[in-house]
């Protein structure tokens, strides 16, 4: 499988001139400017040396409009993009001309406030998905961190727990029962007397039966005929 390759450029440098913004017939903006990058080193004799490279930058659409509005000569920026080479024919000589530029897709302004023509730094801009963030003002740096509020201190002493009311020990058999069973009072309640029952009524005696014996002398003989 053949590799498609990578075409990506990252630059951090300063603008050599103000951006030139123009509009194409379809209404899209195009911005052109140059960015200088410098590198320094020491030669064999220990003398410092410096070399500056100039890069041609092109931006399109909304990113080009932002560059024309915020960037000035000397502004320090961060750029991501890709290399592209344009070809055209010279009208005077008829020869082909070539120009290699960096087609920038993302940009970040690195100047702090007050530098680069008084602009505000820290803005991130990109052409992908048409997302653009306005430059943000840097908040003043504080030399200290706010002291966290301490939690309210609790008293150094703990309240003495209240003891449960003591119950008299159970005196049965000379020992205490084990466990957490409630203890009975040391005295036994006086048993209540059972209610007195009335004596059952005596059975009534039957009236004595009288044995009637007729008196033989009382006129019985009058009815007997002889």
From Swiss-Prot:
<dbReference type="InterPro" id="IPR012340">
    <property type="entry name" value="NA-bd_OB-fold"/>
</dbReference>
<comment type="subunit">
    <text>Homotetramer.</text>
</comment>
<dbReference type="InterPro" id="IPR000424">
    <property type="entry name" value="Primosome_PriB/ssb"/>
</dbReference>
<keyword id="KW-0234">DNA repair</keyword>
<dbReference type="GO" id="GO:0006310">
    <property type="term" value="P:DNA recombination"/>
</dbReference>
<feature type="domain" description="SSB">
    <location>
        <begin position="6"/>
        <end position="111"/>
    </location>
</feature>
<feature type="compositionally biased region" description="Gly residues">
    <location>
        <begin position="114"/>
        <end position="125"/>
    </location>
</feature>
<dbReference type="GO" id="GO:0009295">
    <property type="term" value="C:nucleoid"/>
</dbReference>
<feature type="short sequence motif" description="Important for interaction with partner proteins">
    <location>
        <begin position="221"/>
        <end position="226"/>
    </location>
</feature>
<dbReference type="InterPro" id="IPR011344">
    <property type="entry name" value="ssDNA-bd"/>
</dbReference>
<comment type="function">
    <text>Plays an important role in DNA replication, recombination and repair. Binds to ssDNA and to an array of partner proteins to recruit them to their sites of action during DNA metabolism.</text>
</comment>
<protein>
    <recommendedName>
        <fullName>Single-stranded DNA-binding protein</fullName>
    </recommendedName>
</protein>
<keyword id="KW-0227">DNA damage</keyword>
<dbReference type="GO" id="GO:0003697">
    <property type="term" value="F:single-stranded DNA binding"/>
</dbReference>
<keyword id="KW-0235">DNA replication</keyword>
<dbReference type="GO" id="GO:0006260">
    <property type="term" value="P:DNA replication"/>
</dbReference>
<feature type="compositionally biased region" description="Low complexity">
    <location>
        <begin position="126"/>
        <end position="210"/>
    </location>
</feature>
<dbReference type="Pfam" id="PF00436">
    <property type="entry name" value="SSB"/>
</dbReference>
<feature type="region of interest" description="Disordered">
    <location>
        <begin position="111"/>
        <end position="226"/>
    </location>
</feature>
<keyword id="KW-0233">DNA recombination</keyword>
<keyword id="KW-0238">DNA-binding</keyword>
<dbReference type="GO" id="GO:0006281">
    <property type="term" value="P:DNA repair"/>
</dbReference>
<feature type="compositionally biased region" description="Acidic residues">
    <location>
        <begin position="215"/>
        <end position="226"/>
    </location>
</feature>
